[in-house]
């Protein structure tokens, strides 16, 4: 089974296991109109890609279109806050993660929502690893060589992340600190 097919299967299985496929058992018909899945990161991000795969199958299961809306900003906080303030009618939900529901609560002095009281978890859809990758012409073939290269080229290296305050940004900052290097300039999302 190829990776995309396996990923799609796991995402759909998680959604079905969460009860989304059991709409006939609900007291009222739902959904009767399209449902919006807010992705708190830019189009093309890992979260966006996952949401698009998941929404296609959810649309089939629910019998209504699941529309993706990318609302990025503040490490995902902007999109999540939008859903926190939306009418509690079940027609808008957010695809978030550790960065949007745990990190932001401690990273910002005044987060725009309370993860513990404004939201209820529905399903674990995917677990995602962060990878350290570089161009194949970088003269480093392992982590030890990468650290040595980064130390020898302080301030000259850059990394890409999902944006300031995102999980990938904080992971890079932690890596910088652990390695004692200055790899900077998070690239802005599209």
Where do the language-model regions lie?
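N-terminal export leaders
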Residues: 3-9
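Short, polar/charged alpha-helical segment
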Residues: 47-63, 169-177
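Bacterial N-terminal signal peptides
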Residues: 10-21
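Sec/Tat signal peptide C-region and signal peptidase I cleavage site
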Residues: 21-27
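Hinge/capping helix and adjacent helix->loop/strand transition within the periplasmic-binding protein
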Residues: 85-91, 106-190
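Short, well-ordered beta-strand elements
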Residues: 33-42, 66-67, 92, 120, ...
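Extracytoplasmic "Venus flytrap"
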Residues: 37-50, 72-74, 161-166
């Amino acid at each position: 089974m190829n990776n995309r097919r396996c990923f799609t299967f796991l995402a759909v299985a998680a959604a079905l296991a969460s009860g989304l496929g059991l709409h006939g058992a609900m007291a009222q018909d739902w959904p009767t109109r399209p449902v919006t899945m807010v992705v708190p990161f830019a189009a093309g991000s890992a979260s966006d890609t996952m949401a698009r795969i998941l929404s296609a199958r959810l649309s089939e299961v629910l019998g209504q279109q699941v529309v993706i809306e990318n609302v990025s900003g503040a490490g995902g906080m902007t999109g999540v806050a939008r859903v926190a303030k939306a009418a509690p009618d079940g027609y808008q939900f957010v695809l978030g993660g550790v960065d949007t529901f745990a990190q932001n609560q401690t990273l910002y002095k005044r987060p725009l929502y309370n993860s513990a009281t404004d939201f209820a978890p529905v399903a674990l859809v995917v677990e995602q690893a962060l990878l350290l990758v570089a161009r194949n012409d970088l003269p480093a073939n392992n982590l030890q060589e990468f650290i040595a290269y980064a130390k020898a080229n302080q301030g000259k290296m850059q990394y890409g992340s999902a944006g300031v305050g995102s999980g990938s940004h904080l992971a890079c900052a932690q890596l910088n600190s652990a390695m004692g290097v200055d790899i900077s300039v998070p690239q802005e999302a599209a």
